[in-house]
C-alpha cells in the first residue's frame, strides 16, 4: 500500500446540533458515515480510521471492515478529535502526516485526498487543504467558506464572507486538512484566537500563529451534509448518479 507514513482520520460525533444523529442518517440504504468511509477507503491507505464517541457508529464501520478509534464525546472540535485519535494509533511513531476528512462528505473524491498528501510531502507547508474555483452565484447560494491566497497558493485568510471583496470568481474552501505531525501537535496546543472566534473558523488559529497553509486545486465542490436540507440534496444526488449507473 502507498503512503504508509500517512494516517487518514475521519472524526464522527453522534450528537449534532442541526441534524439529529447525522452520521447515521441514510443516503439510499447506507448511512452517511459509511458512505464517507467507503469513499475515503478508495484512496488505498493502510492507516484509515473513524474517530468516534459512539458505539453505533463504530458498529456500522466495523461491519464494513473499517478501523475505529474511540474518543471522548467532550472533545470540542474535529481537529482535537483527530489528534486524540492519532495518539491512539498503534506504532504512531511511524506516522508523519495526518489527513483529517470531515465525516459529513458522502461523495468525497479519493483523488482529492491523494492530492493533499502529494502537495504536503512535496512542500514546506505545515498544513495543506483543497480549494475549488467557483463563481459568485455558486458561492452566494451556500453558507460556505472562501479563501484568499497569494501567487504561490499560500492561504492568506479564510472567511465566511466572500473574499476578496468585489471579485466575480472565488476560491471555495473544502473542509479537509493534511497536517505534518508536528503541525497538528502544535495546533492543538494553541489557544483559540480572536479571528478564529470571530469567523468561527479554527484554521485561522494556524495563520494567526505564523504557521502556513498551502492550498491545492481540486475540480468539484463536495456535498456536505449539515442540515435536513443538505441531506435531501445528498439523497437526490445519490438517486441521480444511481440512475446513471455510477
Swiss-Prot record:
Keyword Transferase included in the entry's annotation: yes
Cross-referenced Pfam families: CTP_transf_3
GO cellular component, one term: cytosol
Subcellular location: Cytoplasm
InterPro entries: Cytidylyl_trans (IPR003329), KdsB (IPR004528), Nucleotide-diphossugar_trans (IPR029044)
EC class of the enzyme, as a word: transferase
Molecular-function GO term, any one: 3-deoxy-manno-octulosonate cytidylyltransferase activity
EC number: 2.7.7.38
SUPFAM superfamilies: Nucleotide-diphospho-sugar transferases
GO biological process, one term: CMP-keto-3-deoxy-D-manno-octulosonic acid biosynthetic process
Catalytic activity, as annotated: 3-deoxy-alpha-D-manno-oct-2-ulosonate + CTP = CMP-3-deoxy-beta-D-manno-octulosonate + diphosphate
Pathway info: Nucleotide-sugar biosynthesis; CMP-3-deoxy-D-manno-octulosonate biosynthesis; CMP-3-deoxy-D-manno-octulosonate from 3-deoxy-D-manno-octulosonate and CTP: step 1/1; Bacterial outer membrane biogenesis; lipopolysaccharide biosynthesis
Primary location group: cytoplasm
Keywords for this protein: Cytoplasm, Lipopolysaccharide biosynthesis, Nucleotidyltransferase, Transferase
Top-rank taxon, per record: Bacteria
Function: Activates KDO (a required 8-carbon sugar) for incorporation into bacterial lipopolysaccharide in Gram-negative bacteria.
Protein family per UniProt: Belongs to the KdsB family.
PANTHER family: 3-DEOXY-MANNO-OCTULOSONATE CYTIDYLYLTRANSFERASE, 3-DEOXY-MANNO-OCTULOSONATE CYTIDYLYLTRANSFERASE, MITOCHONDRIAL
Protein name (database record): 3-deoxy-manno-octulosonate cytidylyltransferase
Lineage: Bacteria, Pseudomonadati, Pseudomonadota, Alphaproteobacteria, Rickettsiales
Amino acid at each position: 500500500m502507498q503512503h504508509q507514513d500517512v494516517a487518514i482520520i475521519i472524526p464522527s460525533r453522534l450528537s449534532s446540533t442541526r441534524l439529529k444523529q447525522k452520521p447515521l442518517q441514510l443516503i439510499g440504504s447506507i448511512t452517511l458515515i459509511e458512505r464517507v468511509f467507503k469513499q475515503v477507503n478508495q484512496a488505498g491507505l493502510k492507516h484509515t480510521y473513524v474517530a468516534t464517541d459512539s458505539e453505533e457508529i463504530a458498529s456500522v464501520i466495523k461491519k464494513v471492515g473499517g478501523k475505529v478509534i474511540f474518543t471522548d464525546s467532550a472533545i470540542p472540535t474535529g481537529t482535537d478529535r483527530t489528534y486524540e485519535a492519532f495518539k491512539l494509533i498503534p506504532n504512531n511513531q511511524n506516522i508523519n502526516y495526518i489527513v483529517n476528512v470531515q465525516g459529513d462528505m458522502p461523495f468525497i473524491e479519493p483523488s482529492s485526498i491523494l492530492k493533499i498528501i502529494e502537495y504536503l510531502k512535496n512542500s514546506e507547508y505545515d498544513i495543506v487543504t483543497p480549494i475549488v474555483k467557483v463563481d459568485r452565484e455558486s458561492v452566494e447560494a451556500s453558507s460556505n467558506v472562501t479563501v484568499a491566497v497569494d501567487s504561490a497558493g499560500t492561504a492568506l485568510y479564510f472567511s465566511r464572507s466572500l473574499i476578496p471583496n468585489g471579485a466575480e470568481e472565488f476560491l471555495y474552501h473544502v473542509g479537509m486538512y493534511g497536517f505534518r505531525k508536528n503541525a497538528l501537535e502544535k495546533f492543538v496546543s494553541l489557544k483559540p484566537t480572536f479571528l478564529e472566534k470571530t469567523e468561527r473558523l479554527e484554521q485561522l488559529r494556524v495563520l494567526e500563529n505564523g504557521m502556513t497553509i498551502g492550498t491545492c486545486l481540486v475540480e468539484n465542490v463536495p456535498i456536505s451534509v449539515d442540515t435536513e436540507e443538505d441531506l435531501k440534496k445528498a439523497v437526490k444526488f445519490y438517486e441521480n448518479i444511481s440512475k446513471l449507473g455510477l
